[in-house]
Amino acid sequence: MYFQSLSADPLDSVNTTTDFNQLAQLLLMLTNSSSKETIATHVVTNSVPSAFQFDWSSHFKEEYDLVEKLNSPQYTNLTSISPSSSTDSNNLILRQIQIPKIEPALLNQCCLCTFAIVDKEISVVDGKYYHNNCLRCQMCDIPFEYSDKCYVRDGVFLCRADHAKRYQKCCRKCEIPLNREDMVMKAKEMIFHHACFVCFICGIKLNPGDYYTMSPQGHLYCHAHYNAVRSTVLCEEAAVATVPAVVAPPPPPPTTTTAPPPAAPEQPPREASTEAEASTDEDGNGSGSQRSKRMRTSFKHHQLRAMKTYFALNHNPDAKDLKQLAAKTNLTKRVLQVWFQNARAKYRRELHDGGRSSSPLCVSAPLASMDMNPPLSSSSSGHSTDGYQLNTPPLSSEIYSPNSNYTHL
């Protein structure tokens, strides 16, 4: 605000009392209520201080608006000039007012390494910025290409292959992750590829309407090989653990005639036909003179199971098969030959009798049948516990449909 001195012309003069009142009101308007300091007021004194002229021009309104803006917090980085207490107008006080500086826009930062991204090409996942080299699969540590999908789960970045290994269900037979477009067969809670739903022994494909069974290990067996699996499973459950030891011959009689001979050690009781003893002499001959030196073999569960399973496939194995079976069961080749010979004799005797003899190995439970369900049907329908159904899992399941929080580049 600028003030001008009055001229000598009496026509331009005004009343002194009125001018002082207007000047006081102006100073009160220009006083800052918070700091109580006069801001940007310039007064030029004259040799004749008795009379003043006040200019109500547009400059006053502009400067008044400027003072109002200066009181706002965003306009504080200005230098205010106020007159000193003395009458000398040349002595001015400069005061710097602190304000926040206007900074340029922050550069994009990588959310992993927190460094600025200055590359021409960046990766954006879920609205966050990353370096192309920083965005990697956390299992195989391979950076993502532009055509690859990036799966994000629990804050972990995974490629398609590692995500399938970690979260997708796999085929029970080939252990390959199941894709959404794959046709699958479901037996109880186990899922198979359509091509993997075959018999474990002969490899024949199981079709709708065929009879099959499933072992506790998840192996499928057709109706032709059901008997081998039936005897193997029940032998494992019903057989009693036997001591796989060779009974030593009785000790020689004492030399003295006065003392009574010691009692012979008790022989372990012979089991039923499930124990499958190999009654052979030590030298391979069945002569009665050496019957006292005959060694009797008792088989373990896994040995008996392996021999019965192989007997269901081949009743008369050759030398090569016996060698492999001996390495698997830890038995001698001679013991295996005798066991297969006795098993063949028993099998022919049962066929000659006109039917299988009643034994605790028979299974009274019916075989399970399987049905083919429509592609989108659920497997939770009520059916017998013995029935294994073949169907395709619903495509709307979370196993085969992509999750909502998965994001790709």
Curated annotation (Swiss-Prot):
Q: Which InterPro entries match?
A: HD, Homeobox_CS, Homeodomain-like_sf, LIM_Homeobox_TF, Znf_LIM
What does UniProt give as GO cellular component? axon; nucleus; perikaryon
Report the locations given in the UniProt record. Nucleus; Perikaryon; Cell projection, Axon
The role this protein plays is: Transcription factor. Binds to a sequence motif, 5'-TTATTGGCTTCGTTAA-3', which may be involved in AIY interneuron function, in the regulatory elements of target genes; binding is more efficient, in vitro, together with homeobox protein ceh-10. Required for specification of the AIA and AIY interneurons and the NSM neurons. Positively regulates the expression of a number of genes including ceh-10, ceh-23, kal-1, hen-1, ser-2, unc-17 and sra-11 in AIY neurons, and cat-4, flp-4, bas-1, ptps-1 and mgl-1 in NSM neurons.
Compositionally skewed regions (Pro residues) per UniProt: 247-267
Record flagged with keyword Nucleotide-binding: no
Where do the segments described as Disordered lie?
245-299, 372-409
| Organs and tissues of expression | Expressed in the AIA, AIN and AIY interneurons, and in the NSM neurons. Expressed also in ADL and ASI sensory neurons in 60-70% of L2 larvae. Expression is also detected in head muscles of embryos and some early larvae but not late larvae or adults.
- State the organism's lineage: Eukaryota, Metazoa, Ecdysozoa, Nematoda, Chromadorea
Q: Which residues form a coiled coil?
A: none
Per the UniProt entry, what are the Gene Ontology biological process annotations, in alphabetical order? associative learning; axonogenesis; dauer larval development; negative adaptation of signaling pathway; neuron differentiation; olfactory learning; positive regulation of dauer larval development; positive regulation of DNA-templated transcription
Mutating residue 340 to I has which effect? In mg158; thermotaxis defects with animals displaying cryophilic behavior
Any idea which UniProt keywords this protein has? Cell projection, DNA-binding, Homeobox, LIM domain, Metal-binding, Nucleus, Repeat, Transcription, Transcription regulation, Zinc
Give me the stretches of Polar residues compositional bias. 382-409
Q: Name one GO molecular function term.
A: RNA polymerase II transcription regulatory region sequence-specific DNA binding
Q: Does the keyword Metal-binding apply?
A: yes
The record, for SUPFAM superfamilies, names: Glucocorticoid receptor-like (DNA-binding domain) (SSF57716), Homeodomain-like (SSF46689)
Domain LIM zinc-binding span(s) in chain numbering: 108-169, 171-232
Query: Record's Gene3D superfamilies?
Result: Cysteine Rich Protein, Homeodomain-like
Feature: DNA-binding region: 292-351
Q: What happens when the gene is disrupted?
A: Animals are cryophilic and move toward lower temperatures irrespective of cultivation temperature in contrast to wild-type animals which move toward their cultivation temperature when placed on a temperature gradient. AIA and AIY interneurons display defective neurite morphology. NSM neurons display loss of or reduced expression of a number of terminal identity markers including cat-4, flp-4, bas-1, ptps-1 and mgl-1. Reduced expression of ceh-23, kal-1, C36B7.7, ser-2, unc-17 and sra-11 is observed in AIY interneurons. Preexposure to odorants fails to leave an olfactory imprint.
Major site of localization recorded for this protein = nucleus
Q: A Pfam family for this UniProt protein?
A: LIM
Query: How is this protein named in the record?
Result: LIM/homeobox protein ttx-3
Q: Which domain of life is it from?
A: Eukaryota
